[in-house]
A protein has these predicted regions:
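N-terminal, charge-rich interaction modules
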Residues: 1-38, 103-127
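Short, flexible beta-strand-to-coil junctions
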Residues: 19-24, 58-60, 78-82
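Short, intrinsically disordered low-complexity segments
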Residues: 36-71
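Short arginine-rich
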Residues: 71-79
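Hydrophobic beta-strand segments of well-ordered beta-sheets in folded domains
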Residues: 15-16, 53, 74-75
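Short proline/glycine- and acidic-rich turn/helix-capping motifs at secondary-structure junctions
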Residues: 45-50, 79-95
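Intrinsic-disorder/low-complexity regions
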Residues: 62, 83, 124-125
Length: 127
């Protein structure tokens, strides 16, 4: 089985983590550059705790929805709430201790994935 703790660290205007197979890391890097982002560095590293959250500031909600569908995930978590991939509707919520504001909800530019969901499933399927 592939290592579920493999994650991608992205440095840029803001930093983020996403758990992903190497092929997705390359795809993400290309897409970020196409969107005009200029990450200083993208490196693979290991993050140990399975309950960690991975923050991907670069993804718009529409991109997060597309990604979740690509990996057959029923829903995904964003700063705005939990989005159902079948309907595209988001139930808004504020996770305990998670900071967010109206500007984040308006821009829909901050996707958050808990470990063990969409991308980790892809890693399991690659094994």
């Amino acid at each position: 089985m592939a290592e579920l703790s493999e994650v991608i660290k992205v440095y840029g205007k803001r930093f983020g983590f996403i758990s992903a197979p190497p092929s997705y890391m390359r795809k993400l890097e290309r897409e970020l550059k196409d969107l005009g982002y200029k990450p200083e560095k993208i490196e693979a590293f290991y993050k140990g705790e399975p309950e960690d959250w991975f923050y991907v500031p670069y993804l718009k909600m529409s991109d997060g929805l597309k990604l979740a569908k690509e990996y057959n995930q029923e829903n995904f978590v964003t700063e705005a709430g939990v989005t159902d991939t079948s309907t595209g509707k988001t139930k808004r919520f504020a996770p305990s201790g998670h900071k967010f504001g109206a500007d984040a909800l308006a821009s829909e530019s901050y996707a958050v994935y808990p470990k063990g969901t969409a991308i980790s499933v892809a890693l399991e399927n690659d094994a």
